[in-house]
Amino acid sequence: MHFIVVGPMYHHYSESVVRTLNQLGHTAVFFPEMPFYENCSYLQRKLYKFGYRTLKMKWEKDWQKRAIRFGQEHAGKYTVFLCLTGGMITDGIMDAWEGFPIVLCMWDSIRRYDISFQKRLQRYTHVFAFEYEDMAYAEERFSLNMKYLPLGYDETAYYPQERDRDIDVAFVGTPLQNRLDILERVAQYISTAGGDMCVAGRWYDDTYPWKKHLFRKKHPALTKYLMNCNIPPTKTAEIYRRSKIVLNINNDVHRSISPRTFEILATKTFQLMNEGQKSYGTIDLERDLVLYKDGDDLLEKIDRYLKEPEQRNIIAAQGYADVQKFSMRELMRKMLRCI
């Protein structure tokens, strides 16, 4: 099959999907989603804030025209259009793709999108759910038969490698209030204990000195360990392989297992994750990692497992064994069998 993949640019997941499809013997080309607010100029963003809404409308119409033209240039007899999230797909684009199979892989809950997006789901040939509970919702609301397909880890980046684990606790991700609160407490603990910690991600805009000052004032302990920049998967995996404990602090929106969970396990690293996620038949939350209830429980478990390297290794090895079936290659194979 020949895939025309349309998806977002964040975290290299689209790139991983395209590469995997090519490795599996298919051909795949990529057309990136370009949301207005994330890609426009500083001036356009300011004008939009002041009420020039037509800027966004023109941006999106131009993108839609380019997407249709890209499809026309690359479509052939055995073409499948594969939409990753589908956030910028419109009825006009789907009209232009009529006659070809159109597949949607969600990377978020469909309930976080507006009703027009949800109704459009019925136009896809196949729809794969990121949130397990979306399947029942789609069946009830739209008589739509979705299939569950988690977002897998990229095995070219996330794999085990023997090396010194010189970082006691690590976290890689974006700033959320619950993460800030938890990580400030963990940083205070690590500092007092004389350990080492690494937190990576863009947590404030360092082009403005006052934002850096404000962050340091609010989170003095965390600032000491913060690598304030976005890092690629290879660098993320390197941090995991150097860490005794990697924290997985999920947001309150998602309940299904996140790709970050798989990525940590794939490096054969011990993982501490907050309670609230559900396995839905993926990994075993009782043996592949350790869950914590709240901040106090997390600090107790960090203290305990830093002193128990053998137990960490046993749990990490079990998690690594169980996560093998959730690599990007295995999950793309599952998708291909369904379509």
Predicted regions and their residues:
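A charged, aromatic-enriched C-terminal amphipathic alpha-helix characteristic of glycosyltransferases
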Residues: 307-337
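Conserved acidic donor-binding segment of nucleotide-sugar-dependent glycosyltransferases
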Residues: 289-295, 304-310
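Nucleotide-sugar donor-binding catalytic core of glycosyltransferases
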Residues: 1-49, 59-69, 84-88, 118-262, ...
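Short acidic/histidine-rich motifs immediately flanking catalytic phosphotransfer sites
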Residues: 74-80, 243-244
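Glycine-centered loop/turn motifs
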Residues: 76, 285-287
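Active-site proximal beta-strand in glycosyltransferases
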Residues: 82-85, 95-110, 128
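Short amphipathic alpha-helix with an adjacent loop that forms part of the alpha/beta core around
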Residues: 70-74, 305
